[in-house]
Amino acid sequence: MSYIGLQQDSGEYKIQKIHAREILDSRGNPTVEVDVFTPKGFGRAGVPSGASTGTNEALELRDADPNRYGGKGVLTAVKNVNTIIQKELLGLDVRNQREIDELMIELDETDNKSNLGANAILGVSMAVARAAADSLNVPLYRYLGGSNAFTLPVPTMNVLNGGKHAGNDLAIQEFMIQPKGAETFYEALQIGAEIYHVLGKILEKKYGRSSTNVGYEGGYAPKMSESTEALDALAQAIEEAGYTDTEVTIGLDAAASEFYEDEAYAIDGKKLSAPELMDYYVELVNSYPILSIEDPFYEEAFEDFEALTNELWDTIIVGDDLFVTNIERLSKGVDMGAANALLLKVNQIGTISEAFDAANMASRNGYTVIVSHRSAETEDTTIADISVAIGAEMIKTGAPARGERTAKYNQLLRIEEDLGEVAHYVQL
């Protein structure tokens, strides 16, 4: 049971002021930051943005002014917060998260939040939650998750980049390590960091110093062209760091919509049909310690997701662009048995309440829940608290490098420390 909704009529928790501003994200592009003030507390939230985005995502509002930031400014979204949204929310109890989120959705009057902007709405939604937690003097994870918030997720760390996240010829977007054999999150982070550094040395020796240049999410981006090159490097790094393939597994984010064209998938220098691509994944799973595959097919290929989920029944098949954290699309997937895990991105849907609804639907139907960052992040750590609040099995927030990535991992260290003996590291 969370603290949300346990409000008594008190002016101490009423929203006094909302202020938004334009800040920079980790890719040097503008994004929205929002401050929410009450007599008893304050909340601040920064909104992330994606590089590979699903077409069904909630829409972030960009100014399209070519004279500012190449058209990527967010002053319109900022203005919407400071005028339209603030006017409607002033005086409301900051603890009424769902009421506030639903009011913003009604104000927007579109299915994809394109009027006010998902970046405007989400910034307010997250800042409201933070202000409520601060006003109640409780940690955000405890405010959102209540007494059930005591599990720490397994980090799935993007240590080797391809696709839209790098400038190489790898079709698969992310190659991740998952220290699932750790006993604590603290130990998991250490394992991940050790493997990351060993991997860097392996890549530099084989491909040269430029191979340790990093992508958007802190992972290395070597000049590779085939998935097996990347997987071999990961397997070698895990072993040389002193760990086994049962202690540390591998995750893939294919982001297949990005290499799907004319009903074929361009990967490893070949063009494959959906059945051929499925055989390709099966072969990889049989050859490497792969625990999870995210977005293995085009974002509308529900039937192909279903077929792969049935074929690789003991592998975590993750829907990201497939579901876009949307309960209608998730419900379709559940009914079909398409995928068995949800990638939860709050900015895909645009409010805390809707993200929690998606997480609850996934969990009720036996789906693994993986909380995720975006390729363009800020130093905001809200998703770390959310992952604990909803009891997510995994968190995906980049390599153990770059400040906007380590901010989330470091917050999880603090949460584990705060929980003390009741903290439980998820066993996959």
Curated annotation (Swiss-Prot):
Gene3D superfamilies: Enolase-like C-terminal domain (3.20.20.120), Enolase-like, N-terminal domain (3.30.390.10). Its cofactor is Mg(2+). It comes from Methanosarcina barkeri (strain Fusaro / DSM 804). Pfam families: Enolase_C, Enolase_N. (2R)-2-phosphoglycerate binds at Q173, K345, R374, S375, K396. It is an enzyme of class 4 (lyase). Belongs to the enolase family. The lineage of its organism: Archaea, Methanobacteriati, Methanobacteriota, Stenosarchaea group, Methanomicrobia. This is Enolase. Mg(2+) binds at D253, E294, D320. Its EC number is 4.2.1.11. Its main location: cytoplasm. NCBIfam families: eno. Pathway: Carbohydrate degradation; glycolysis; pyruvate from D-glyceraldehyde 3-phosphate: step 4/5. It comes from the Archaea. The keyword Signal does not apply. GO terms for biological process: glycolytic process. It is found in: Cytoplasm; Secreted; Cell surface. The active site is at E217 (proton donor), K345 (proton acceptor). Catalyzes the reversible conversion of 2-phosphoglycerate (2-PG) into phosphoenolpyruvate (PEP). It is essential for the degradation of carbohydrates via glycolysis. Disulfide bonds: none annotated. GO terms for cellular component: cell surface; extracellular region; phosphopyruvate hydratase complex. It catalyses: (2R)-2-phosphoglycerate = phosphoenolpyruvate + H2O. Binds a second Mg(2+) ion via substrate during catalysis. Keywords: Cytoplasm, Glycolysis, Lyase, Magnesium, Metal-binding, Secreted. The gene is eno.
